[in-house]
């Protein structure tokens, strides 16, 4: 008889702060920063999340989120979609009545993301060094509550 292990995710940090981006700017938010990213954007401000981290169960993550006493949770990285168990985490957070957003690079499929999650897609410009990783067809899956983020690093990015 085999035993199925509960899903776990590699976690860099969980903290409470004010959201500084997207339409929730200024809103108290719990950030769940997952470890790992397949991209290496030149301007990345979270390279510390590429490696390391600790394995956490979804139950433990939700318990910690609950302790921080806010209603908005942002799952970020790294690239959260690089961890297959992120989908179970997103659904569990939504089931627990949190408003959930997902910050993603736009380089991975959005098909399995829970429809209750607000997707914030960071479309990569040439200045990122990762423009070829954009999955433009994924933008068709966005709805009216989802958002696109574009980091402009130069005039060339702006003109792009």
Spans of model-derived segments:
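Residue-level preference for alpha-helix termini and adjacent loops
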Residues: 13-17, 23, 30, 47-49, ...
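Radical SAM enzyme core and accessory elements
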Residues: 1-6
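Anionic group-transfer/hydrolysis microenvironments
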Residues: 15, 35, 47, 76, ...
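Conserved AdoMet/S-adenosylmethionine-binding subsite of the radical SAM
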Residues: 81-160
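Short hydrophobic/aromatic-rich motifs at helix boundaries and adjacent loops
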Residues: 34-35, 62, 133-134
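N-terminal pre-triad scaffold of radical SAM enzymes
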Residues: 7-43
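Conserved Radical SAM active-site core
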Residues: 9, 28-29, 39-117
